[in-house]
């Protein structure tokens, strides 16, 4: 299980012959586990706390939505902490999932993670996106 306000929140650790070990976690604000042997990561990166705070202060979102976002979705900062808590030495791709339309900045998120992991392909999920997940980058 993952941390979320849904009835049955789950993340998945998928093992496949061609793409290796894939972490899939969305609709969670925090992952308390470490995952050995990862080859690909699909991880929620829903909002920037700074953008969320600015939108709340400006009245673009109400208090209930603000609080629910924090308690049920993964921030950029928690996404970074999750990545840093795991051994990513064999990871080929990081796919950022479930970005908020109003409280995220895909370009900033990607660049921030690329600075930490320049050897890994970092992508934000979009409609129609097609990626190749392999155990090896070549």
Language-model-derived ranges and their functions:
Residues 1-40, 133-138:
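Core dinuclear metal-dependent hydrolase active-site scaffold
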Residues 35-127:
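Cap/insert and terminal regions of metallo-dependent hydrolase folds
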């Amino acid at each position: 299980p993952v941390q979320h306000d849904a009835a049955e929140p789950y993340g998945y650790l998928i093992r496949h012959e061609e793409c290796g070990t894939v972490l899939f976690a969305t609709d969670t604000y925090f992952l308390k586990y470490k995952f050995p042997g990862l080859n690909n990561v699909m991880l929620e990166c829903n909002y920037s706390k700074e953008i969320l705070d600015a939108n709340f202060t400006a009245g673009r979102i109400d208090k209930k939505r603000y609080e629910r976002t924090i308690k049920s979705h993964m921030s950029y900062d928690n996404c970074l902490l999750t990545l840093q808590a795991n051994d990513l030495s064999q990871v080929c791709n990081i796919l950022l999932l479930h970005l908020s339309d109003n409280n995220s900045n895909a370009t900033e998120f990607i660049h921030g993670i690329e600075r930490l992991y320049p050897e890994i392909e970092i992508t934000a999920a979009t409609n129609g996106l097609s990626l190749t997940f392999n155990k090896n980058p070549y």
